[in-house]
């Protein structure tokens, strides 16, 4: 199965072998455990800056999605890409337009795709200009992509580099902010779980895996390349299919007691990050952001409850878009 990207060369998530391996390998250094660990101090600062702003208000209220969850991954991705924090509002607008617009919003969708392509095109062109003037290529994501090669020695095209950066932005923001928001929504609804994580912060990593399983944000679309049969179902070439990872995570043949949310679940072979060769390359980063975001929130805001209606996204990524809270 595969799916061509808009605007030229496909990014790694839609490449097929053998080029998929080359495209993925070029991105791996940015997402190793060691590379992600280097981002922890700044991620913790980002979380505390956001919490500082929340706690300076007089009304003891906050929207965990709007005030917190939506900002953390935007600023971490900006850090990873070496672009200003101030570009975050633009990033959020693009993500909402691309992942949550209906088919009737195609003009808005196409505009956001064009703006994103232009943004990263300028970023790549500027780096190429700097290198041509004698600067070092750099070891960040842009530098890694510009020095990457296919097995035959061919450099990645500029279009491929731009589309890979677009992928990192789309895949690394909405999914993570949805997961942070869902975790805080759960903890606002289940005070026993919240109290336990406050007193036993060592449980947070296990709780994160359970939140990822129970509230997995991603459903992936694919186009069938060849007639095939899967699970007794016939699929024809050219048909589109959806791979609902959230449904897999609630399959009793896959997970024991799938409808129970157990923050100390011992075995948790969830599929929130996908499976196989296209498994999410940024899972280490997402887990780190979730861990730090929950640690800092619970350390500084240990008691909170829902304070109004929660709204959820529609589209390919599912997550809470409004989580109004009363901070006790």
Predicted regions and their residues:
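Cytochrome P450
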Residues: 1-328
């Amino acid at each position: 199965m595969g799916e061509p990207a808009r605007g030229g060369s496909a990014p790694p998530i839609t490449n097929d072998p053998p080029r998929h391996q080359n495209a993925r390998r070029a991105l791996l250094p940015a997402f190793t455990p060691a590379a992600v660990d280097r981002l922890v101090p700044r991620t913790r600062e980002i979380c505390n800056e956001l919490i500082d702003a929340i706690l300076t208000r007089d009304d003891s209220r906050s929207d965990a999605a709007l005030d917190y969850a939506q900002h953390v991954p935007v600023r971490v991705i900006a850090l990873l890409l070496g672009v200003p924090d101030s570009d975050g509002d633009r990033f959020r607008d693009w993500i909402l337009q691309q992942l949550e617009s209906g088919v009737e919003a195609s003009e808005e969708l196409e505009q956001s795709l064009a703006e994103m392509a232009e943004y990263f095109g300028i970023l790549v062109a500027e780096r190429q200009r700097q290198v041509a003037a004698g600067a070092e290529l750099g070891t960040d994501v842009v530098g890694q992509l510009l020095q990457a090669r296919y097995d035959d020695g061919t450099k990645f095209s500029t279009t491929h580099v731009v589309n890979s950066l677009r992928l990192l932005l789309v895949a690394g923001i909405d999914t993570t902010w949805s997961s942070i928001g869902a975790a805080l929504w759960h903890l606002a609804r289940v005070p026993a779980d919240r109290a336990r994580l406050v007193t036993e912060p060592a449980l947070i990593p296990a709780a994160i895996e359970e939140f990822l399983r129970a509230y997995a944000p991603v459903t992936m679309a694919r186009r069938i390349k060849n007639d095939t049969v899967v699970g007794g179902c016939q699929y024809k070439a050219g048909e589109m299919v959806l791979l609902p990872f959230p449904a897999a995570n609630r399959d009793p043949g896959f997970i024991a007691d799938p409808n129970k949310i157990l923050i100390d679940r011992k075995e948790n072979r969830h599929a929130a990050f996908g499976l196989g060769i296209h498994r999410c390359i940024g899972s280490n980063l997402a887990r780190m952001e979730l861990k730090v975001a929950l640690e800092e929130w619970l350390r500084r805001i240990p008691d909170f409850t829902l304070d109004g209606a929660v709204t959820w996204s529609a589209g390919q990524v599912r997550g809470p878009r409004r989580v109004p809270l009363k901070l006790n």
